[in-house]
Design a protein with these regions (language model features):
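All-alpha prenyltransferase/terpene-synthase fold signal
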Residues: 1-323
Length: 323
């Protein structure tokens, strides 16, 4: 199923999600409204709330509470973006100035905290202790992932296992929670819940692998952020690690230095040349496709419906995207 058909299938639910986001973002504090609306209206993909919507419908849910789960998932994602951009000192996201560039670091951190806590208020309104347990653990793991990534900056010697732990924690865990919590809310079987959980984990991993690939292969204007940001920040992502470990001694030394010292955007061209020589981007995409295939396989426990087909379609779209 292509994105157009997925959007048609989820149009009513996603309209409810967007309305809930705007309603729950409201505050008596003007700066919260201004900054919150600024980042929420930034044109994100909304893939995480879409997963929540589709997962609930795929196991036969007929109510409306899944809209709340989808909205709070987007809130948690948005709060992490606000904090990420402060930590990374980023100045562009989704083709416009980051919130920290537009409003300052302090405002971004504090409004991010407001959005986090509003998400937990929304969780308690659902009346499900298990959803609260899964989501609170997920947010804790996400925070750990961000700290792990910070520890890995400028370290060219991290293992692939360490890298995969980071992307599971900071990205895939929220995908996993989105699918799992919708299943819990819908009262699905334990086997279906496990299938949805696995789907989210594998899809989130594939999604982040492609994100890391696009940092070196996409057009900056199309991508909506600066190409080579990871290199400039000294982040040892999978494409970079692959090129360092399979390049010539000269290429490996150059990449190692770029990771250790950061501020390596001027080395982007020779780094890309090394990646081309080593097939690093193709290898990373292949790894992402393997994760997407595992996500699709995890859905076999679900009944054959358009909702399941849409979840399968999202897995294909996640690895075929160019931004």
């Amino acid at each position: 199923m292509n994105l157009e058909k997925i959007n048609e299938l989820t149009a009513q639910d996603m309209a409810g999600v967007n309305a809930t986001i705007l309603e729950q973002l409201n505050s008596d504090v003007q700066l919260i409204n201004q900054l919150g609306y600024y980042i929420i209206s930034g044109g994100g993909k909304r893939i995480r709330p879409m997963i929540a919507v589709l997962a609930a419908r795929a196991v036969g849910y007929q109510g409306n509470a899944h809209v709340t789960i989808a909205a709070l998932i987007e809130f948690i994602h948005t709060a992490t973006l606000l904090h990420d951009d402060v930590v990374d000192e980023s100045d562009m996201r989704r083709g416009k100035a980051t919130a920290n560039a537009a409003f300052g670091n302090a405002a971004s951190v504090l409004v991010g905290a407001f959005i986090y806590t509003r998400a937990f208020q929304m969780m308690t309104s659902l009346g499900s202790l298990k959803v609260l347990e899964v989501m609170s653990e997920a947010v804790n793991v996400i925070a750990e992932g961000e700290v792990l990534q910070l520890m890995n900056v400028n370290d060219p010697d991290i293992t692939e296992e360490n890298y995969m732990r980071v992307i599971y924690s900071k990205t895939a865990r929220l995908f996993e929670a989105a699918a799992q919590c919708s299943g819990i809310l819908a009262g699905c079987t334990p086997e279906q819940e496990k299938g949805l959980q696995d789907y989210g984990r594998y899809l989130g991993t594939a999604f982040q692998l492609i994100d890391d690939l696009l940092d070196y292969s996409a057009d900056g204007e199309h991508l909506g952020k600066n190409v080579g940001d990871d290199l400039n920040e000294g982040k040892p992502t999978l494409p970079l690690l692959h090129a360092m470990r399979h390049g010539t001694p000269e290429q490996s030394a150059m990449i190692r230095t770029a990771i250790e010292q950061g501020n390596g955007r001027h080395l982007l061209e020779p780094v890309l040349e090394a990646m081309t020589t080593c097939g690093s981007l193709e290898w990373t995409r292949q790894r992402a496709e393997e994760e997407a295939d595992k996500a699709i396989s995890a859905l076999q426990i679900l009944p054959d419906t358009p909702w399941r087909e849409a979840l399968i379609g999202l897995a294909h779209i996640a690895v075929q995207r160019d931004r």
